[in-house]
Amino acid sequence: MCGVRVVARVAAALLVIVAAAPATADARFKRCRSDATIRCGTVTVPLDRTGRVPGSVRLYAEQVPAEDQPPGGGAGRLVGRRAAPRGAIFALAGGPGQPATQFTSDFLFAFGDQAAGRDIVTFDQRGTGRSDLLRCPEVEKVALLSRYPESGQKCAERLGDRRGLYTTSDSVDDMEAVRRAIGVDRIAIYGASYGTKVALEYARRYPDHVERLILDSVVTPDGPDPLYRDTFNASPRVERASCGPECGFTSDAGEDLVAFARQLGDAPARGFVVDRRGRRLAQSLGSTRLLFLLLAGDFAPRIRAALPAAIYSARRGDPAQLLRVASLSEQSAEPADPRDFSTAVFAATICEEAPQPWRRDAAFDDRARQTDETLARYGDDAFTPLGPAAAAQSDLVQLCRRWTEASPGPPSVRPPLPDVPALILEGELDLRTPLEGAQRVAAQLPRSTLVTVPATGHSTLGSDGSACTLRAISRFLARESVLSKCANPSKILPPEHPAPLSLTEVAPFKGAPRSIARVLQAVDLTLNDLEDQAASQAVLSFDAGDNRSVAGGGLRGGRFRVGTSGMSIDRAVYAPGVRVSGRLLNRAGRIGIFRVAGSPAVSGVVEYRGGGVITGRLGGRRFRVRLRRVDTTPPDIELGRLARPVGAVPGVR
């Protein structure tokens, strides 16, 4: 759906508040964009509400008055229900660290008719976007925060006393200030990822102003867990679900992950990745890198589809596919533009309030020992299948390892959550905020409905390829019953298959002469693989603003480059012993001539003539066959993008 694709830009880090009381515009809100429907203004709040640290924060906000909103679109169109009372829709960004005003138009489009009669208001949380942007060059310059723990220490030193003033509690107080400035009373809150933590805390603190809660990819009230215990324990289940019924190469993808992780406990997987110049670069993969790769699949169906086969192959000693998909996912892990994501706010919020495996007053040199003691106290089963060593090296632990806390931290005992109607939306394949955590939160909310969205990862509003999430939200806001199961769920992207270890493992090409059937199939598999890699590289180049041509390496050797006329291929190897070179033309269907090299029995020429016709000579024998290819990609699949494994934490990039 078009609306789902637009919402995907939000990347699961947003908090929306739907108010049921009449809204009054603040006099400071003026038209401020080329889009005349959007108005902007500011709400000034204290930097430190205790007065200990002087200063203030100007919260930048945008407002789309109900009377200026175009009709039609969004979730409301899906369910023809009565119009809701006039009110306001507020949007808070999560992350923590992402500004919300860049998504004002996206929310207007996504909620469509459901916003009829309500103003839409977004604002940048303190320290993000245009709300007095918080900067820490030390953490802005690195993509994988876990590799540079000293960056967290330098950021804390730069921020000084301010570092303790960007907590969830501060965000809740800011949210209340904006609610008062806009002039609404009771509000329904939609939150995604970290936004659910803000939503739950706001509901706990200001229950009289909360009409209902919508929690999408919920972070537990005491989370996020720097040790990723829920993520670890849920990963075998998610691998099984990602594989679906089409993984004929394995009987249990979850057990493959468990067994492979056990192997990594003895030694990392070692192999090579072929770069865009055709060079073979040595790489290794341990349990921590595997953790970030699993998390990268939350926003990237292609990664999820690749992982079961890649893990299966790595388990039997061939890590080529796994190392390549890990390398591709990390290529997108570029440092974020601070205007789009404040890594300083992220560090300040997480390091001040996440429950670290050491005492808050622990000396830096003693934190490693206390971490080991905490891991031992939890026991190995708490970290199945990746193991406690991966937990100790997580991004959230390493980022905060040398951070001196400036705030007292969250209370150890919190009041119960309020008794308000709640809709909890959870992706079946979500590893950042797994289903198991959502179930615990649902048990604390007496009037909650938990909807598990199949074939969907983190942030159901942004990644659900069906209408399930939008329908559930629409019905819930209309005070109608919501089914706990999706009527027409998305289908998973068909899983990839393990790459052959030898030509004898390649299935014969149907209809081809027996003597060349495996070779011809190997050529076809090579072209399939290169086309898939070109598509992934194109996404990476677009996201990075890279104007270079799309290029990459073959799985086991060679390289490819995509130009205006098509793809040039130089000695690409997918099946061992079969090298493919030539040009795949940029035309409808597969058309091109390819030289095949290897032993005399496999060498020759293969020509794809279009219309599924393949001719040529292999091993001295002429042939002519017709390709019978079936595209098994469901038409409603949202392919998404390669997710950034940086800060693999709820709601972050």
Residue ranges of predicted features:
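Secretory targeting and sorting signals
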Residues: 2-25, 43, 175
